[in-house]
């Protein structure tokens, strides 16, 4: 089973920037990374209204596979069940990965000891709310909070600024993965 790192936090707290930073730098170090993002918008679709793939699905296809020279996309039209961690990880079963990074999914990962976590927050209150009910391991807190409380910690968890201290966060992740 793969190592799993979850980046959890409220909307606009810095989750995607954190994922982007980590994926970029972990790949540079030679690691193979998979990622999954929770989308909480009920009307979200990756497909575009009127495009050919949309037309396939609109006609009733349960699964639409798009293939080009450089990319494969699989669109499954289904009402999502109450996803579990294993359901998400099963989506990666056809390949080997050094690390799976999850963005969001707090309700799935917050009480899982086997999932490494990084919390993103806007401010101290936001961080404390997210930390409440989230069990270790929690490597760090990052995101917009680092503009306010850079170099500090909350509940002995370091607050790391990605711009100036990103290497520190990367090292913490590498120690857990390797």
Language-model segments: residues:
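Phosphate-binding/switch loop-helix module in NTP-utilizing enzymes
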Residues: 76-107
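Hydrophobic anchor at the beta1->P-loop junction of P-loop NTPases
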Residues: 7
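N-terminal phosphate/diphosphate-binding loop that engages ATP/GTP or pyrophosphate donors
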Residues: 23-80
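P-loop (Walker A) phosphate-binding loop of NTP-binding proteins
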Residues: 10
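Walker A (P-loop) ATP-phosphate-binding motif of ABC ATPase nucleotide-binding domains
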Residues: 4
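Phosphate/Mg2+-binding loops and adjacent switch elements
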Residues: 99-158, 163-177
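Post-Walker A alpha-helix
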Residues: 18-19
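Conserved lysine of the Walker
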Residues: 15
